[in-house]
């Protein structure tokens, strides 16, 4: 391949327009009536959860074959439906259920094997393959209002808002992928103006993502997320404190030898977004954070392969470091790094609002929920993870070597970072204050 920008993105299930989102809208329902059992249950999932009848329905469900799934879109739809049903089964009772029904576990494992993704609730199940463009809006679809969810646990617009925020972020970021590929070529050709143009586009893209993320509070309350939605997004990993020391038991069909095995997977997490990891790879930030690397295992296989390819060819940071200390492109790179740090600060504020603060409050039934304080849906220590990712991002700045201060303006709506000029030292101090206030 002469030019990296000529890479066939479709071979990695990517689009030059929608990025990691499907180029064609995901299915709202499997077309074959054979799968009506699954689809009817998923459509009625909020009612079944609310009436505590999901367990009985799933335990009496017949085992359906995956042989009639006819296209990539159908396999993805099956994965979404089975993931929602499995998560609903595990977490809808007073205590988590440790054994999945075989009618869910067996096809979920087969579908996941086909799609090369983990057989559990993931970012792909909740967002990438679950959310579709709203018929009310035309192109381009880059705002939360432009999308709707096909499956939910609660039937609430608040839950849908949580998913469509993430999808709007993916939609905005997807258009950056061709520019990243061209920037790699630009470095090889020593075309500094093209690198400069890419960094400007990168900054604009991250600005747009921050504005979307900062809208989470418009239609999602703390209480709803923490007490009603968050439990369904959890995994079985690191969950001994709630009665899952070994994770979840996935039974096998007799044709597979019978019995089964205990599997402990992380819950769905935005750390499973390939887009954000691609941004890190592109700028050369956060390359040694173990949790981020682990989360690649929960991405669709083709997306994971694309990130591995990009890791092997990423060349922007070495090129920037080769430029003179007075290079305006070097300063622009630092500006891009600080934008990415600003995004992580915005994420910190969202986590504080929806996990850390309500964790110390009484839930609607009057019981305090302290056993998971400080843990994200992925099962990790959220504060440790956020510290590590932000510090890794900031450490990529080059400004120390040129003896001057990088001054930067952040999007006005990102309250954590402020709207005025801010240098790297100030950003670190502000971030530390935010973390200390949250932990207190």
UniProtKB/Swiss-Prot annotation:
InterPro entries given in the database record: Indolamine_dOase, Trp/Indoleamine_2_3_dOase-like
Which pathway does this chain act in?
A: Secondary metabolite biosynthesis
Which terms does the UniProt entry file under GO BP?
'de novo' NAD biosynthetic process from L-tryptophan; L-tryptophan catabolic process to kynurenine
- Tell me the cofactors it needs: heme
Q: What happens when the gene is disrupted?
A: Does not completely abolish the production of quinolactacin A2, but leasd to substantial attenuation of the titer to about 5%.
Ordered alphabetically, the record's keywords are: Dioxygenase, Heme, Iron, Metal-binding, Oxidoreductase
Q: Which Pfam families match?
A: IDO
Family to which the UniProt record says this protein belongs: Belongs to the indoleamine 2,3-dioxygenase family.
Name it.
Answer: Indoleamine 2,3-dioxygenase qulI
What organism is recorded for this protein?
Penicillium citrinum
